[in-house]
Amino acid sequence: MKLKTALMGAAALLAFAPAAFAERGSDGELKIIQSQAASTMNQYLSSGTKDINASSMVSEPLASYKPDGTMMPRLAVEIPTLENGGVSADGKTITWKLLPGVKWSDGTDFTADDVVFTGQYCMDPAGGCAQLSKFEGIDKIEAVDPLTVKISFKEPKTNPYSAFVGALAPILQKKQFEKCLGANASSCTDANFKPIGTGPFVVTDFKTNDVAVFVANPNYRDPAKPAFATATLKGGNDAMSTARAVMETGEYDYGWNTQIEPEVQAQMIAAGKGKFMTAYGGLVERLELNMTDASSALPEGERSTAKHPHPIFSDIRVREALSKAIDRSLLVEIGYGEAARPTCNLVPAPEMFASDNTGCLTQDVEGAKKLLDEAGWTDSDGDGIRDKDGKKLSLVYQTSVNPIRQNFQAMIKQWWNDIGVEVELKQIDPSVFFGGDAGSPDTFQKFYADVQMFANEWDGTDPQAYLAQLTCEKAPKPEDQWQGENIPRFCNPDYDALIKEMLTTADPAKRADQIKKLNDMVTKDAMVTVPLANRARFSAVSNTLVGVDMNAWDSEYWNVADWSRAK
């Protein structure tokens, strides 16, 4: 309780801290450290939050989400609505008026052509766009004039605020990326590492999986911002050293994703150099169960693809047994304390969308054993490991290097061992695991394992695009550079049909019911996604840094232009 009070008090003090700007660059260097290093500066080539945060300092969308979940215009004059004529009465078009006078960091004009091009870039079927679900249902994107963009949908769309809204869908400069369409997307190294943007900073040096160096954008539209002349974003550190670099040594101003044990949090707060800030949204630590065979005996290009169904997980009783064996409350108590809560939902928030899905919250070891018995998995030779038709019930369980995740792995392995499942644990450097490199065998998109654990979320308060990631067509595969969003390779035509129906549902109550049903279809009904904990965003902030406004619905750096040094 003391820790909770300290966290809330620190956040309140920070929220009311004064932020005054003398002139652009007057506060010297901003130093950010991430527990996971950035691998790219192009949000469209990565699903990793580490990359999306880093890129958001440079590239901007037409609109962003504020901490209260409401939208704010960024590169647009206003948010299009039915009332102001920006959204058509039939729900089939949305028209954005662009902010006049905006310059790219190279001094050229930002225009509607850049917006249209960005849509073409992501929707190219050969490009492997990691944010393709943000463009779901779009028929065409047109430049009406240099400052007006019209998006037309194939069917009436009740939530047209997806493409170009939030940190996942920024605008790319057409001039820089026009030769990077389709299969060329991932090979445009210069553009992907040093994008020309409209945001407050410009990349001057980028070392993948290590460090990014920025300078203030000389053409940023607010002449007084950013307050910092330069910024350094260092990565590759674990959560503990990231937190220490802010809270104990004071070497850094901001530490992203400081997942550390509750008792250590309290000790660091007592040092008096900083505070931890939290914000609850849709961030869920989960297990993903691979519905395809990841065996290394298969030819490269066929592993973890629909050509080969998983030999064990094709039986839902096995998947259910693995979930039943887990004590989620104990995981949260040991791993997160006040910074998380147990959940069975992929969509735990906002409350209006959260399913009454609580069946997984009580551990049921005997129920898990019974399910495996019914599925025909028994210990025929008495070695403690179940087998069936000569095959051992043996799984590879991978995740990123992180002390809490390794604790979770050890605990879950023991619970699974207790029900007769053999488990091999694998840990991967987070910069590689979340990096999206099509040439690496260790990315979470390739999923060369049976089970993997990570956390993911969506921007904004509407999970429409997030849930649309799990349609059949979005499974990662070699043809799209392994950039698909459907990580477990889940495929259910009924799910796909309900996604399509939801896109055109206007009634809020019916829409909420659809979201709950979609959530249940991938969790308790299919158990391909096994939620563990609804995590708060949890980062360390120096007492010398003001203006930070923790945001659960957008990039944590969504207002980095407003950050400054305490006077």
Model-derived features: where do they sit?
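Short N-terminal segments immediately surrounding and downstream of signal-peptide cleavage
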Residues: 24-37, 170
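N-terminal lobe/hinge region of extracytoplasmic solute-binding protein
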Residues: 33-87, 120, 196-198
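Gram-negative bacterial Sec-dependent N-terminal signal peptides
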Residues: 1-21
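Short, P/G- and charge-enriched loop/turn segments at secondary-structure junctions
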Residues: 66, 137-138, 185-192, 198-203
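Extracytoplasmic/periplasmic ligand-capture domains
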Residues: 21-24, 65-67, 84-85, 92-130, ...
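Surface-exposed binding/hinge segments that line
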Residues: 131-181, 205
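Mature extracytoplasmic/periplasmic domains
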Residues: 339-357, 538-540
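Glycine-rich and polybasic anion-binding loops at the starts of cofactor/ligand-binding domains
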Residues: 532
